[in-house]
Amino acid sequence: MNWLETALSTSSLKEAPAVAVLHLGCEKNRVDTEHMLGLLAQAGYRVEGDEDSADYVIVNTCSFIEAARRESVSTLMELAVQGKKIIIAGCLAQHFQEELLREIPEAVAIVGTGDYHQIVQVIQRAERGERVNAVTSSLDYIADETVPRYRTTHAPVAYLRVAEGCDYRCSFCIIPHLRGKQRSRPIESILREAEQLAAEGVQELILISQITTNYGLDLYGEPRLAELIRALGQIPIPWIRMLYAYPTGITPAVVEAIQETPNFLLYLDLPLQHSHPAILKAMNRPWQGQVNDRLIERLRQALPKAVLRTSFIVGFPGETEEHFQHLLEFVQRHQFDHVGVFTFSPEEGTPAYHLPQQVPEPLKEERRARLMQLQQGIAFRRNREQVGQVVPVLLEQENPRTGEWIGRSPRFAPEVDGVVYVRGPGSLGSLVPVQITRAEPYDLFGQVVEAPAGFSWSGR
């Protein structure tokens, strides 16, 4: 029995308030949620999986773009209608604390992105009848391996936050205002948490921060991602994946570290945002000298087996049909494995909010659909190349009715990419060799087989 199970089973908890936590938004928000759950359980609160039976409902909100805000507000209003005592946490709380407290009387507390570690004290104050505004403008906190954490992901998968905040100022992005400046964890702290997760049986470790490739710059005076990759390569976890790499941060030193670390997956998440120099310049992104083309070509040469994921924004202010055609040609030329496409969301407080030549919403949606249609064909072609190959698959779910497994190969990251549907023997949380028998645009299908000679469990 682990510490959480022990805490949840003690009789004293029967008198403690029950708390449910709803997580919205990205993986960074998920880690905050997991730390709040861990702190609450350690303090003796009953953590419920269902908000209906909870005394308090904590909603860890997202405020990255308009659609995320709408989802967060909709969730809060549904709970308010039910008469729940709500604690609003996360990015929406950081962004709009006064408005939320004014408009949602059911909110007994509000907790900012730099204050989630005080969740126990916040609830204690709310229990005494205080309406709590725990939002600080001093965004300098980052949890380490000593802070209790209860993972909400599938058992074999864990996110590992290496840094928090961002020092870049992309003209469309509100994140630096919501999360503060970059603050990296020491390598030793990250390695200790990785060892803890390995001891829990984690099979896939996913490195995250706002700009993962800038890891260590604030702490050591220079990026230390290459050193971190090599150090994590010594941890007994079969798969290590990295998300949120800034294009110019994939330096030759980082590429060399990836090449030399067998359990580091050949999967690169590079949010490029656009291809046309004029739009990139307006976004305050790297834009000179075909920087993105050169990067992709260099990566294809150095890491020919690498899976490339990227994301783009369409409908940025001033984007013309010529600019958009440039983006279509860029995607066609580079044949990315996975692409996410967002329509520009004007965020108050960012430079792009005031730019002229705002693109009409219907045109944004049309361009998004055209780009996604192009990428669907590319993704299907990429997936069809997998048919006949034997690849490692991490089994994450089982369909009890059919006996079919649902898992992922190294080419698929959780939540954002596809899955592999697997038939054959296996166990939950295990890695198995699977021969791919069929492909769809976003998913694969296969059968468990014997591992061939020289089989790579990281898919290299």
UniProtKB/Swiss-Prot annotation:
Which reaction equations make up its catalytic activity? L-aspartate(89)-[ribosomal protein uS12]-hydrogen + (sulfur carrier)-SH + AH2 + 2 S-adenosyl-L-methionine = 3-methylsulfanyl-L-aspartate(89)-[ribosomal protein uS12]-hydrogen + (sulfur carrier)-H + 5'-deoxyadenosine + L-methionine + A + S-adenosyl-L-homocysteine + 2 H(+)
Q: Does the keyword Cytoplasm apply?
A: yes
Location, primary (coarse class): cytoplasm
Q: Which cofactor does it need?
A: [4Fe-4S] cluster
User: Which GO biological-process labels does this protein carry?
Assistant: tRNA modification
The TRAM domain extends over 384-450
Q: List the disulfide bonds.
A: none
Q: Which family does it belong to?
A: Belongs to the methylthiotransferase family. RimO subfamily.
Main role? Catalyzes the methylthiolation of an aspartic acid residue of ribosomal protein uS12.
Q: Name one GO cellular component term.
A: cytosol
- The MTTase N-terminal domain is annotated at 17-128
Which residues bind [4Fe-4S] cluster 2 per the record? C166, C170, C173
Q: Does the keyword tRNA processing apply?
A: no
Q: By what name is this protein known?
A: Ribosomal protein uS12 methylthiotransferase RimO
